[in-house]
Amino acid sequence: MTRRWALPLLLIAFGLFYLLPLATHGLWIPDETRYAQISQEMLLTGKWASPHFMGIRYFEKPVAGYWMIAIGQALFGDNLFGVRVASALSTGLSVVLAYLLARRLWNDPRKSLASALLYMSFTVVALQAGYANLDPQFTFWVNLSLVALWFTFDCRTTRGQVLAWVALGLACGMGFMTKGFLAWLLPVLVALPYAIWQKRLRSLLIYGGIGVLVAILISLPWALAVHSQEPDYWRFFFWHEHIRRFAGDDAQHASPWWYYLPLLVGFSVPWVLLLPAGLKQAWQQRRQNSSGFLLLWLVLPLAFFSLSKGKLPAYILPCLLPLALLMGNTLVDRLAAGKTRLLAFNGVLNLVAGLLGLLALVYFQMKKPVYVDEPQHLVLVYVLLLGWILSNLLQAMRPLTLWAAPALGSFLLVALAPAALPNSVVYNKIPDQFIIDHVAELGQAKALLSNDLGAASALAWRLRRPDVTLYNTEGEVKYGLGYEDTAARKVDLNQVQPWIAEARKQGSIGVVMRVKSSDEEHEVELLPKDAKRYEQGNIVIFIIPQSQP
């Protein structure tokens, strides 16, 4: 029964809770609008080798992730679903990998289903599936490389080992073209100690060349093409995005070594209490090949990222698949032994968290409302909170038969939460929806201007026009603006009025401003007084009319 219905049930959950919500809310700034615009620009210009952000060189990431998002927009259109579908499909494929690897490790359909369901219902995994960035894609390629690595050691035939190494090389090549050299490093971190432990180092060195060759064959054509078009690409990408980020004294997002430990606990929601039990059982079974391999996969990348100076939460997403398998193994073993107290306590913990969330919402709505004149959003919040509470109540009351109930609460949370956001968040962080309301006037403008990269990329994506001039801002495009052919894409406070005076001779100017401080209010003051003004949250749209001859 479990074997027959496992994958269909997972597929139904994927469709209902991963795919359907993709188009229910606008694009977040700055990440989603950036990736949407860069990918759309590839479709518009045909420049597939060198990434450009609103026509400005942008060398912070390779191209494969943009290609996938561009394919989504090519197939489904320049819309919210088209932008996000690559993230959803990448996460769905990682769920399939969890199922297949669990089946290979234990040949127990219950453990296969439990492992895949736990991974799929990790709240952070499900949230990433509906968010347009490169992390879900990179996570899939790393997951595929390490699943393939297990098969390279586990296969007993030469043909099976060769095919596994080919798959590993494919994953490393695509992972490298998605986010860089980490796609090569992470499998090596696991492969070397595991091969030494298993006394298979000779086999690793003999057959490993197949994976290296495949990875090179996949990535080399693009590597040569981008070097030919942009000779400085590799210098910037290697030193800025790898050495400085992970080892430099001025590393981005510097955090202490223990930064990821509480995050790992948070990332295991709604199965938090299975985390210590899963790790304990894995340590007790560490001499078994399966547990030892999964522990290496979990611990070594986690240690590497903990020791690096620059840290972001998404870096440890590849650690969650082995964690889900270890926890799924423990869960099924406990169910088989009739030990359900831990699962009941897990349900109680989630239930208490849900009740506290509900009480906090009621309190703030009475004292300082989060939702003002938006009953539809408030209803959605109550629905998702009640769904969370009821699903975890079921696990607490019937842990033996309804052990999977928290997954439903997690799915409801990630499916409904984006559509239930208060207007105060939507108006300030999702400007593309406001831009849609005025797209006719903005689309007629001969020139476009914005003081914020997130708002500018939302404008460029919605209008399918990369030619947005940046007003007194540069941020992550500082490097690209240093090129002579794009230096004019930015105007500062002293240049903006002459620029407007010249630009409005040709036609109207569409301006999207993000006004959060007195500095930005001063930027607004320098705009012409005869402009039409539309305001929503901290996003302000101006339509500056064409000047009279």
From Swiss-Prot:
It holds the Pfam family PMT. GO terms for molecular function: 4-amino-4-deoxy-L-arabinose transferase activity; mannosyltransferase activity. Disulfide bonds: none annotated. GO terms for cellular component: plasma membrane. It is found in: Cell inner membrane. The chain crosses the membrane at residues 9-29, 80-102, 112-132, 133-153, 176-196, 204-224, 257-277, 290-310, 312-332, 342-362, 377-397, 402-422. Its EC number is 2.4.2.43. It is an enzyme of class 2 (transferase). It catalyses: 4-amino-4-deoxy-alpha-L-arabinopyranosyl di-trans,octa-cis-undecaprenyl phosphate + lipid IVA = lipid IIA + di-trans,octa-cis-undecaprenyl phosphate. Catalyzes the transfer of the L-Ara4N moiety of the glycolipid undecaprenyl phosphate-alpha-L-Ara4N to lipid A. The modified arabinose is attached to lipid A and is required for resistance to polymyxin and cationic antimicrobial peptides. This is Undecaprenyl phosphate-alpha-4-amino-4-deoxy-L-arabinose arabinosyl transferase 1. It comes from Pseudomonas fluorescens (strain ATCC BAA-477 / NRRL B-23932 / Pf-5). The gene is arnT1.
